[in-house]
Amino acid sequence: MAKKVQAYVKLQVAAGMANPSPPVGPALGQQGVNIMEFCKAFNAKTESIEKGLPIPVVITVYSDRSFTFVTKTPPAAVLLKKAAGIKSGSGVPNKDKVGKVTSAQVREIAETKAADMTGSDVEAMMRSIEGTAHSMGLVVEG
């Protein structure tokens, strides 16, 4: 018989840096999950990813307090900021441009995010990433 799902918990946790402090501890603690077990499993799964990069994770908590989790790719905005070498996007993206990214960088980000995005092809995903770049005040060259 299949386990009964008690809850889905969505978090963004830094790769390789999960620990029982907020936001992980309170979110999982109220579901009755063994927090250290999750932290060890998450850190082991994300050890190949650049340390500190925020990784979205969906944790499925079952009624017997066991859990499974699925990691996603980092948000497009984070990857764009890293590619452009900036700390944050523009507060007024239509007026103030804060950096530049090339089409090659946009393609690389689109290919990285391909598993999580619903676009039909790489070109459609690239347009989506370009839209995110424009809304952050980045100029796409090429």
UniProtKB/Swiss-Prot annotation:
Share what the entry says about its subunit structure, partners included. Answer: Part of the ribosomal stalk of the 50S ribosomal subunit. Interacts with L10 and the large rRNA to form the base of the stalk. L10 forms an elongated spine to which L12 dimers bind in a sequential fashion forming a multimeric L10(L12)X complex.
Could you say which protein family the record assigns here?
Answer: Belongs to the universal ribosomal protein uL11 family.
The record's annotation in NCBIfam families points to: L11_bact
Provide one Gene Ontology cellular component.
cytosolic large ribosomal subunit
Q: What's its job?
A: Forms part of the ribosomal stalk which helps the ribosome interact with GTP-bound translation factors.
Q: Which Pfam families match?
A: Ribosomal_L11, Ribosomal_L11_N
Keyword Ribosomal protein belongs to the record = yes
A biological-process GO annotation: translation
Protein's name in the database: Large ribosomal subunit protein uL11
Domain of life according to the entry: Bacteria
Gene Ontology terms, MF aspect: large ribosomal subunit rRNA binding; structural constituent of ribosome
PTM statement from Swiss-Prot or TrEMBL: One or more lysine residues are methylated.
Does the record's keyword annotation contain Ribonucleoprotein? yes
Q: Which UniProt keywords apply?
A: Methylation, Ribonucleoprotein, Ribosomal protein, RNA-binding, rRNA-binding
